[in-house]
Regions:
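Active-site histidine-anchored catalytic micro-motif
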Residues: 1-163
Length: 163
């Protein structure tokens, strides 16, 4: 099975400037993460954008939908910032991308920090996209959720079933 990974930025790919203390984007860490995880999957990686998810708008979501629609692969993982991941999942589900299994994932801590959850979440998403039926899902914290039954708990910092 071939899997397409769409990179959109988010905390997942942020870098830390030690002089100013600010977080910024340079390039995706995906290739390093896949190498470090010893992935042997057939993957096509495409950077769509590198933005903080708080900057994600309808135009950005339309770009992501278009890239998913154009993808030859039936399995797609999207790296995305956690703040608006659920909104993007909704846009993908409403776009009616029949026959595609799409899993969004991200990180609460930048991969550049040794304590990041990014590598674990990426591995989980790559596993889930291979076994879940067509649809749109969010994969965080070792769990997967249907797009319409998940929320980010801002108090605990984890994704959970939405009420």
């Amino acid at each position: 099975m071939s899997i397409r990974i769409l990179v959109t930025g988010g905390t997942f790919d942020k870098e830390y400037d030690e002089l100013t203390g600010r977080l910024y984007f340079r390039d995706t860490h995906l290739d390093e993460m896949l190498r470090r995880g010893r992935s042997r999957l057939d993957l096509a990686v495409e950077t769509v954008m590198m933005i903080d998810s708080l900057e994600m708008d309808d135009r950005g979501r339309a770009q992501i939908v278009a890239r998913c629609r154009a993808a030859a692969e039936p399995a797609i993982v999207i790296t995305h910032g956690t703040d608006t991941m659920v909104e993007t999942a909704r846009a993908l589900a409403e776009a009616g991308l029949a026959g595609k299994t799409i899993v969004l994932t991200g990180a609460m801590v930048p991969y550049a920090f040794g304590s990041s959850d990014g590598l674990f979440n990426l591995g989980s998403a790559l596993s889930f996209v291979q076994v879940l039926p067509p649809g749109v899902y969010v994969a965080m914290n070792g769990r997967h959720f249907p797009w319409d039954a998940v929320r980010k708990n801002r108090e605990t910092g984890v994704f959970e079933v939405s009420p």
